[in-house]
Structures are given as C-alpha cells and as structure tokens.
Amino acid sequence: MEEFNLDEIDHLLTTTRAVRKRLDLSRTVPRELILDCVKVSTQAPAGGNYQKWRWVIVDDPEKKLVIAEAYRDGYAPYIDAQKEAVSNKIPDDPTVQKIMSSSDYLAEILEKVPVLAIPCSLGSPADMEGDLGGGLQGWWGSVLPAVWSYMLAARARGLGTAWTTLHLRYSERVGEALGIPSTVTQLACVPTAYYLGETFKLGKRKPAEEITYWNTWKQSSIEGS
C-alpha cells in the first residue's frame, strides 16, 4: 500500500480557501503553470470515463473585461439580496461582514486577476432529464470534481483561486466573447493568481461528529456504530 504524508495532504485539503482580497494582481501567471493544474484536473473521476470537461483559460484583458462585466451584472442583485437578508438577521456579525467585503472586492477587480479559468462541460444537465438513477446528480458529479482538483493543484503551486458562478446568468454573452458553443455548459469562473502572504489557516467549521450520522439520519453519536 502506498504511504502518503497525511500531515501535508491534510494541510493542502484544509487550507485551500476561497481567495479574493489576497489575489496578487501584479504578477503574471505562466501558462505552463496553469496547464499543470489542468493536467491534474483531468485525473478527477468522471462517470463512464466520458471526460466531458473542457477548460477555457482567459488571460486576454479585453475578454477578461467581458467576463467581469457579466459577473458584476449578476453580482449586483445577488449581493443586494444577501445584504438585506443579513441586515434582518445578523447585521453585526463580523465574519459575515468580512465575507461581504471580500466578495465586493472581487467583483470590483475581477478583470485585473491574471487568469480567469472557465471550466466547461460538453452537453447540458438537461441531457439527463428523464434519466433513471439520479442522472442529474451524476452529470454534475462527473465534472465538478475536476474543478476542485484544479483548485487544489493551484494551491499546491502557490496560486489562489475562488469558485464563482455569478457570471453564469449571462453565460451566453460570455460564451459569445469566448467562442463557446451553445452545446457546451459553463460551470464556473475560477479567478487564479499568485496569493499575497505566506499561507492560509483552517476555516471555522462544525465538528465532524455533529454532521456525521451513523446508520440513520441525525444519529450523530460517534459511539453509535
């Protein structure tokens, strides 16, 4: 059996954060480095080994601006609704305010990020309508692991990323600018850059014991096996 350095692997898995304010906008990211991340992503599991994922890597300033403007158009109504909801429930929560601030920042500077990676998939979730056996979940489950693998590979190479989807409301506009056919589904936009600072720390999460159920829903006692 292969042996891995679990401390190093767990550190990678638990400190791959959504990076916004710490993206280094001043450093060019070599295409070879991005391609290395894509190579890693192609080893992600995919149902039937269909390998329907495709990557459109955007480093052209004019095309990045198209994506950023679509993102801001999608972001505005989303963040307004979020801020209203927060103000009614937890208006003074510093963690929430920090997230809102970093989200605002990313929307403002998105076109300045060195690389915007657009993961795509051939076909559409609609292709699975009427499919027996959880076809819709299988469709997404066959493409999204590759995106996460890309983000982990980027983190291991000193790059920061963030998973964003708000440009998708205007995916046709972006698709036209990037030459993406209508038969291809855009999955996300992953801004990619070197990050500022030394490292990242673990996020605040609920204990595994509280969210793990043994043999029946909401039986969360770890001794319940």
Describe these PLM feature segments:
Residues 1-36, 40, 59, 66-69, ...:
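N-terminal accessory segments that position/regulate proteins before the catalytic core
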Residues 2-4, 8, 15, 20, ...:
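C-terminal helix-cap and adjacent tail motif
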Residues 37-42, 117-176:
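Small-aliphatic-rich amphipathic alpha-helix that forms the alpha element of a beta-alpha
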Residues 40, 100-104, 174-177, 197-199:
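Glycine-rich, charged/polar anion/phosphate-binding loops
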Residues 44-50:
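Glycine-rich phosphate/pyrophosphate-binding beta-alpha loops
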Residues 52-53, 113-116, 187:
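Short, surface-exposed beta-edge/turn micro-motifs
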Residues 57-143:
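Glycine/small-residue-rich phosphate/adenosyl-binding loop
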Residues 76-88, 178-202:
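A glycine-rich helix N-cap at a beta->alpha junction
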